[in-house]
């Protein structure tokens, strides 16, 4: 039920859920990171929403593709924190 993410040359991770008001489609994520405890999410062209456990749960980008809402903090299941990433449908 969560969105599946992939890192560039790193381990994958699974987000716990999706933002309310989205299409319900999985979002693919790519991120760069350094050891830490969170992952930053930003919107990118074609994006629908940030992760379900983002800093502002319930925020949706539906109808506003390409709008950048700013960094979101998402708990890292892999112990890797990093720079903002794009979540795209």
From Swiss-Prot:
Keywords: Glycoprotein, Secreted. The keyword Mitochondrion does not apply. Glycans are attached at residues 3, 7, 14-15, 23, 25, 27, 29, 34, 38, 42, 47, 49-50, 54, 59-60, 67-68, 73, 76, 78, 83. GO terms for cellular component: extracellular region. Residues 56-71 have a biased composition (Low complexity). Coiled coil: none annotated. Residues 1-89 are annotated as: Disordered. It comes from the Eukaryota. The keyword Secreted applies. Heavily O-glycosylated at most but not all Ser and Thr residues. Expressed in the submaxillary salivary gland. It is found in: Secreted. The mature protein contains tandemly repeated, identical sequences. This is Submaxillary mucin. It comes from Canis lupus familiaris (Dog).
């Amino acid at each position: 039920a969560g969105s599946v993410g992939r890192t560039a040359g790193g381990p994958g991770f699974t987000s716990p859920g999706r933002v309310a008001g989205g299409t319900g489609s999985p979002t693919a994520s790519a991120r760069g990171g350094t050891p830490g405890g969170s992952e930053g999410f930003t919107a990118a062209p074609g994006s629908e929403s940030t992760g379900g456990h983002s800093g502002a749960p319930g925020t949706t980008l539906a109808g506003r593709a390409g709008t950048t809402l700013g960094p979101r903090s998402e708990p890292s299941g892999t112990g890797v924190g990093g720079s903002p990433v794009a979540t795209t449908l």
